[in-house]
């Protein structure tokens, strides 16, 4: 993901998040540090989703996963998360974490397929409505079973949903 993708990513965020990151903040996240990794998914030559990972010590923090409403349900989120997981393995990370709205059952289900498990709650985390965030972790990133689980989730998704042209 690079400078050329920023406007498409910003447009997706504005469609799916109540309080999206600003273009400037997003640019800083994408281009700012060697400890931040962002990927995009494309279908039909257009950006339809993106995801970000921040590395802190030996852990990865999934900072965002967003899919255009017109592409939701096609397995794009699964493919994006899988790419972040692969990156975490290649960086020799040992764990990954994320926050998800407590009410976002589709996302929670996806994260569970990858081995993320609830470990706590951040009360009132989302400022738009005071909703709690569920904190989820996966601690076996360095174990070969982790990437096997990721690839199995991707294979199932491709078989049932298709997915984007590429991530």
Regions found by a protein language model. Give the residues of each.
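Acetyl-CoA-dependent GNAT
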Residues: 3-74, 78-91, 139-143, 149-167
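Short glycine/proline-centered loop/turn elements that form peptide/ligand docking sites
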Residues: 81, 104-107, 124-129
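Conserved GNAT acetyl-CoA-binding A-motif
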Residues: 88-99, 110, 122
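Residue-level recognition of the GNAT/N-acetyltransferase active site
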Residues: 68, 72, 101-103, 128
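Conserved catalytic-core motifs of GNAT/GCN5-like acyltransferases
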Residues: 97-99, 117-134, 146-147
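Conserved active-site tyrosine of GNAT-family acetyltransferases
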Residues: 111, 116, 136
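Conserved beta-strand edge residues that scaffold enzyme active sites
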Residues: 23, 27, 102, 125-126
